[in-house]
Curated annotation (Swiss-Prot):
GO process annotations (BP): thiamine diphosphate biosynthetic process
Major location category of this protein: cytoplasm
Family as reported in the entry's similarity comment: Belongs to the ThiG family.
Reaction equations catalysed: [ThiS sulfur-carrier protein]-C-terminal-Gly-aminoethanethioate + 2-iminoacetate + 1-deoxy-D-xylulose 5-phosphate = [ThiS sulfur-carrier protein]-C-terminal Gly-Gly + 2-[(2R,5Z)-2-carboxy-4-methylthiazol-5(2H)-ylidene]ethyl phosphate + 2 H2O + H(+)
Enzyme class: transferase
Localization in the cell: Cytoplasm
Recorded name of the encoding gene: thiG
Organism: Erwinia amylovora (Fire blight bacteria)
Job of this protein: Catalyzes the rearrangement of 1-deoxy-D-xylulose 5-phosphate (DXP) to produce the thiazole phosphate moiety of thiamine. Sulfur is provided by the thiocarboxylate moiety of the carrier protein ThiS. In vitro, sulfur can be provided by H(2)S.
CC annotations in GO: cytoplasm
Biological or metabolic pathway of the protein: Cofactor biosynthesis; thiamine diphosphate biosynthesis
Lineage, broadest ranks: Bacteria, Pseudomonadati, Pseudomonadota, Gammaproteobacteria, Enterobacterales
The name this protein goes by in its record: Thiazole synthase
């Protein structure tokens, strides 16, 4: 489903901002996630220890270009990530607005085109804009990662109708909600809408109990997916009686 990989879990988890490496490891294991995102900014003085932890966890690593604001920065970071982690996967972020951390659509498409042409399998962090989505697919991306809300905001699905339109328009394209999810109920809602996965970080890393929150999100994402698969009833403006009137007592 995600390029050459079909995960059992639809929960993708970030690795930044945890209280300790031990809690990070416990949260990843509790989440059941098979894909974890990693920033090259972690590769400082303790980079070796962090890579050792990644090896121990035996998860699929999705490096990202977090913090990049230009095409050159993002492309250079992607090449470094491919060399360091020995993977063609890259979560492409090209930030265009400092306050909202909204992606720069023009730089994002250009960077995606360059990387896809060189064999990368790009996971683009984008918005719910349909035209931008089309341009990213034309550039060579095989999936899209629209935000639910600004990164780390915890606002959930801020533009539900826009996301519904995106899901409806890109029927056969894997769509992963990336950013803005703050509560398990929000993740379940996205899965009920038909999205293919949830990527989050802050909601688990900053929770009072990251282990418990990782478990809660795993359950919610699974429940939302199962509900969608089972077939949700249509919403109605008026009540519809669920109890049949046949056989009711007749009073005279």
């Amino acid at each position: 489903m995600f390029y050459d990989f079909v995960p059992q879990s639809r929960f993708l988890l970030g690795t930044a901002g945890y209280p300790s490496p031990q809690i990070l490891q416990q949260a990843i294991e509790a989440s059941g996630s098979e894909i974890i995102t990693v920033s090259l900014r972690r590769e400082g003085s303790q980079g070796g220890a962090f890579r050792a932890l990644l090896t121990q966890l035996n998860k699929r690593v999705l490096p990202n270009t977090a913090g990049c604001h230009t095409v050159k920065e993002a492309v250079t970071t992607a090449y470094m990530a491919r060399e360091l982690f020995n993977t063609r996967w890259i979560k492409l972020e090209v930030i265009g607005h400092a306050d909202t951390l909204q992606p720069d659509p023009f730089a994002l498409v250009e960077a995606a085109r360059i990387l896809c042409a060189d064999g990368f399998q790009v996971f683009p962090y984008t918005t719910e804009d349909l035209i931008l989505g089309e341009k990213l697919l034309e550039a060579g991306c095989k999936l899209l990662m629209p935000w639910g809300a600004p990164i780390g905001s915890g606002q959930g699905l801020r533009n539900i109708e826009g996301l519904r339109s995106m899901r409806s328009w890109f029927k056969d394209i894997p769509l992963i909600i990336d950013a803005g999810i703050g509560a398990p109920s929000q993740a379940a809602q996205a899965m009920e809408m038909g999205f293919d996965g949830i990527l989050l970080n802050t909601a688990v890393a900053r929770a009072q109990d990251p282990l418990g929150m990782a478990q809660a999100f795993a359950s919610a994402i699974r429940a939302g997916y199962d509900a969608r698969s089972a077939g949700l009833i249509e919403r109605r403006d008026m009540a519809t009686a669920s109890t049949p009137i046949f056989g009711m007592a007749q009073f005279s």
